[in-house]
Amino acid sequence: MIRYTVAGHSRRCVVGASKRVGAIKCITVAATKRFISNKSNEVFTKLTNDNDPKRDAFFKYTWGSWLKNDKQEKEKRFTKFSIEGLNRILNDIYIQSNEMAKAPDGKILPPVFNKNLTVSLVNNVVPKNIGKINPNEKVQVTTLSSIHEGKHHRIYKVDTNLNKAFILRIPYPLENENTLSYRIRSEVATMDFADLKLGIKVPKIFCYGVNSLNPVRQPFVLQEFIEGELLMKDWDPLIEDGSSNQKKYDNVIKQVSDFQSKLVSLKLNAFGSIYFNNDLKDGNEKEFVKEDIYDGETNPDLQNRWKIGPSVERCLWRHKSHLDFHKQMKPFLGPWPKKSPMDIIKNTGLLEAENAKTRIAMKEAGSSAELMYPRTLKEQITTYENLAKIAPDLFNVKTKAIPNMQELLSPRLFHPDLDPMNIIVNKEAQEAYLLDFEGACTKPFILQNSPQFIAYDGPKIYDLKEDITDFDKLSEAEKVQYQFMYKRTRNQHQWEKKLNDNNPKLITAVAPPVKLLRSPYIAAVERKTEEEYLLIDESLLQLKEVWDIFAQNDLVNQKKFPLNYSKEDIERHVEDLQKLHEKLISTPFAATQGWIPQDMFDQLLNSGSIVKQENGDYTVKQPEATK
């Protein structure tokens, strides 16, 4: 029997050991960031009964709720998997571990494609990583803990009767299996590359599956459990200068910057994403760059271990499951030769324009139920076609005005989630591990945006007393506003200072003119909502104002700005952008697309601040105007 204990709106779910033979106990404890509750409900179920509906509560999404389409959004994040199938996979990797014990010391073997449609990284499946098992002993899952319900994955901790813990990552089925397949294959290979070639500490991956045909019945990654604390625990972006926590602040900047330095340390031979070379046997060879991923490898075990293939950067795949993959997506995903870095921007624009055109066609044919104004989609087409058009001229790749331009244009590994929330410091050795690499790709450093935890595009204030006239005479509210701007400026400056210390040849990538030149592309990469195409337009119009100066300084390819905007175009843009800003200010939780952390949601619902409607949606009750 499996014993489940379930409580509503949990942040932590635990499956504990039962004394009964062949049984595990599943416990879901309500424990949020703000509130901790010991209330729980226990449910019993058989270990071998994967279809028992009593288990479902353990797999449901519980970390937040949505104001709109809450039921549908939670159903998209339902991560039911086969515990019995997980048991079988664990036993398989221990069998492989015994076989690997016979391999010569230091030998790095290629991944093994198993008959059960999983892949094992046998160089990681060794006794020093997973422990040993007696010849007649079987591995048994004793505890399952749901330790994180993230934006894209559910993370489970798996304890066994061998006193060995693992992490099981299950991606939410927000996209089709083809998308998840590319993403998982690339992420696993990239982490392998980071570990074996770049010397970056990452959790060891033991086994993975890219579709639901494997014993787990879900795409999954089974990897090493790292016990420790997230680096985010030490990060305070609004710390006062000279605070007692200054060392912690400095250490966070250093740790994240050191990871970035290792990521970009090796120049690669193409733009795209990293895959295992033996993925070729089941795929199309034209997907992959034929030449070596990098030059000068002398270790025969690493030669031809990896290849560059289609980019899995999230913006290229987001909300595109309705496109014909081979005809409408694949031509724009790369890989791209290192002589054509600006093709990344061009193809990003062309793919998004194709996506908007298809959505319009589907809507006109009556085959789409999405609530989207045709005008917005038509404006998106214009915006993204403009981005594609300007791409070849954004940077003069032969300019001498930007120092070390060729270094900035070389393919280097880019990690989109370089953040203290994605770094754990292990308990024993106090070593930092970079946790997941989803969406990692290779692109020129000049097109790589700053990590989100230090990114700041607002007014720069480097010294409150010098930059702000009569600062001491301001009201407390005004001082707080300027102090916020100063601290955000300081954080970004400290990051860029560390970049200069670690990689001085790359520092010009953060020069203001370079930031402005890449800003339309960055806005496209970071777009979260339908209306944010306006931020791309805004960046393009800002470039229009300074293009002549950039041309005079040999920064861009064309003397004349490549795009045409009429007076009416600009006026309409200003009006639409103003409406977007007003919407963001007036619409509660617009920044999170209506998602609210569950503890906050419960509190607001119980207080009457959120009201449930007849259709299942929620509205935020506006405060009554004071008379």
Swiss-Prot record:
Main location group = mitochondrion
A Gene Ontology CC term for this entry? Answer: mitochondrion
What residue stretch is labeled transit peptide in the record? 1-43
Matching InterPro entries: Kinase-like_dom_sf, Mito_inheritance_9
Cellular compartment(s): Mitochondrion
| Keywords, ordered alphabetically | Mitochondrion, Transit peptide
Family the entry assigns:
Belongs to the AIM9 family.
**Can you name this protein?**
Altered inheritance of mitochondria protein 9, mitochondrial
- This chain's source organism reads Saccharomyces cerevisiae (strain JAY291)
Taxonomic classification: Eukaryota, Fungi, Dikarya, Ascomycota, Saccharomycotina
**Which gene does this sequence derive from?**
AIM9
